[in-house]
Design a protein with these regions (language model features):
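Conserved alpha/beta-hydrolase "acid-adjacent" motif
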Residues: 299-306
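Conserved acidic catalytic loop of the alpha/beta-hydrolase fold
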Residues: 131-151
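Conserved hydrolase catalytic core segment
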Residues: 150-188
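N-terminal cap/lid subdomain of alpha/beta-hydrolase-fold enzymes
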Residues: 57-119, 307
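Active-site nucleophile elbow and catalytic-triad environment of alpha/beta-hydrolase enzymes
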Residues: 266-282
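Catalytic active-site module of serine/aspartate enzymes centered on a nucleophile-bearing elbow/loop
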Residues: 318-357
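Alpha/beta-hydrolase-fold enzymes
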Residues: 173-257
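Short beta-strand/loop motif that positions the catalytic acidic residue
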Residues: 286, 292-294
C-alpha cells in the first residue's frame, strides 16, 4: 500500500489536482484483478541480469481479445483506472468493453508494485531504460500470460513512448497501436532539459547523499512541482484558473502543501529512463495500424516543431489526431481524459485488420 500511495502522490503533484475538471462516467466494468509474475534472468541493457517482479492488473477474461494498456512516468496501473480513462473506455458499449476485451495493465519496471530500487537495492539496482521496460512488458504478456498476439497496444505519456517502441520492436505482435501524449523522436530539446533540471535538483540536494538518504530529499517536492507546472496543465486552462497573482499563488501553495511520498531513487530512475528514448530508427518497421493522439497544447510535445508530422510520414499505416487546445484541455495531461478521443479509438478498432490471434 505504501508504494501505491507514493505513485498516487507523484501523479497528483504533476496534475492540476482539483483544477482538473474532467467529467467521466463511473466505472461499471468488471472488478480489476491483480497478479505478479517473475521474469527470471531478465537482462538489462547494461548487461546486468536478475529476477524481476512484474505486477499487473487485468480486467475482463483471458478469452477476450487482449489489449495492453501502458501508464505514464511515476505511475502504475491505478492511473489507468480513473473515471476519466477507464470509466470512459472499459464499460459496456465503450471502445474497450471488458466483456469483449482482455485488458492487461502492467506496472512498469521501477514502478508501482514491480521491482524497483526502493525494494532494497537502492542505487545498486540496474539502470533501466524504455527498451528494458518494453522487453519486460513483452515477457510478461507472452511468457507470463501466454498471449500470442495483441489486438491493441495503447499508452499515455511514458506509456505512449513505450507504444512507439512496441510497434517497431515487435511489429507483428499487434493489430493496432495508439501512442498518446508522445512523439516518435529522440528525447531532446526542452522536454529533456526540464527533466534533467528536475533530476539534478534532487541529486544536488545534500539530503540525497548519493542515494543513501535517511529521509527523502526536501528539494524533491519543489523539483517535481516546478516540472509539473512547466510541462503540464495547458496554457489556456492556467490562464482561466489563475488570471491573477493571488489565484496563481493559491495554486502553487496548494501543490506545495501536498506530501510527496515517492522514493527519490525510484523517481530518479523512472525519469532518467527516458534519456536515450528514440524510436525513430524503427518507424519504417511498424506494421500495425497506428493512431497517434496528441493535444495541441501539449507542453512536452509541441506540435509546432513539426517533428511528429515529419515522423508520421514514415509510418505506413499511421495517422495523427490532434486534440484542439481549449480551456477544457490540460496540455500534456489532456489525453488522460478519453472523452476527447473515444470516438476515434472506436473507429480504429472497427477498421484495423485483425491479423493472427
Amino acid at each position: 500500500m505504501k508504494f501505491s500511495r507514493a505513485a498516487l502522490s507523484i501523479a497528483l503533484a504533476l496534475v492540476s489536482l482539483a483544477l482538473v475538471s474532467f467529467t467521466a462516467s463511473a466505472a461499471d466494468y468488471p472488478t480489476p484483478k491483480q497478479g505478479d509474475w517473475i521474469a527470471k534472468d531478465f537482462k538489462f541493457h547494461g548487461g546486468e541480469t536478475m529476477e524481476v517482479r512484474l505486477h499487473y492488473t487485468t480486467i475482463g477474461e483471458p478469452t477476450g481479445q487482449p489489449v495492453l494498456v501502458l501508464h505514464g512516468s511515476g505511475g502504475s496501473a491505478a492511473n489507468m483506472l480513473t473515471p476519466a480513462f477507464g470509466g470512459e473506455l472499459f464499460g459496456p458499449g465503450q471502445p474497450l468493453d471488458a466483456a469483449k476485451y482482455y485488458i492487461i495493465i502492467p506496472d512498469a519496471v521501477g514502478h508501482g508494485k514491480s521491482s524497483k530500487p526502493s525494494d532494497g537495492m537502492k542505487t545498486a539496482f540496474p539502470k533501466y531504460n524504455y527498451e528494458d521496460m518494453v522487453d519486460a512488458h513483452y515477457r510478461l504478456v507472452s511468457e507470463g500470460l501466454g498471449v500470442k498476439h495483441l489486438r491493441l497496444v495503447i499508452g499515455n505519456s511514458m506509456g505512449g513512448m513505450h507504444t512507439w517502441i512496441w510497434g517497431g520492436k515487435y511489429p507483428q505482435y499487434m493489430d493496432a497501436l495508439v501512442p498518446m501524449a508522445s512523439q516518435p523522436t529522440e528525447m531532446a530539446a526542452r522536454n529533456w532539459m526540464l527533466r534533467r533540471m528536475m533530476l539534478e535538483t534532487i541529486r544536488n540536494d545534500p539530503d540525497y547523499n548519493r542515494g543513501n538518504y535517511i529521509t527523502q530529499p526536501r528539494m524533491m517536492k519543489y523539483a517535481i512541482n516546478a516540472y509539473g507546472i512547466a510541462t503540464a496543465g495547458g496554457t489556456l486552462a492556467y490562464q482561466m484558473q489563475a488570471p491573477t497573482g493571488v489565484a496563481a499563488d493559491k495554486i502553487v501553495d496548494d501543490r506545495l502543501a501536498l506530501p510527496i511520498t515517492a522514493d527519490a531513487n525510484d523517481f530518479i530512475y523512472q525519469w532518467e529512463a527516458s534519456h536515450d528514448y528514440n524510436p525513430s530508427p524503427r518507424l519504417d518497421k511498424i506494421e500495425a495500424k497506428l493512431l497517434a493522439i496528441n493535444a495541441a497544447d501539449d507542453e512536452r510535445n509541441p506540435p509546432e516543431t513539426g517533428v511528429t508530422d515529419a515522423a508520421m510520414k514514415r509510418v505506413k499505416n499511421g495517422q495523427l489526431f490532434l486534440i484542439p487546445a481549449s480551456t477544457e484541455t490540460r496540455g500534456h495531461l489532456t489525453t488522460g481524459n478519453a472523452a476527447f478521443y473515444k470516438k476515434q479509438l472506436q473507429e480504429l478498432l472497427q477498421t484495423a485488420p485483425q491479423r493472427t490471434m
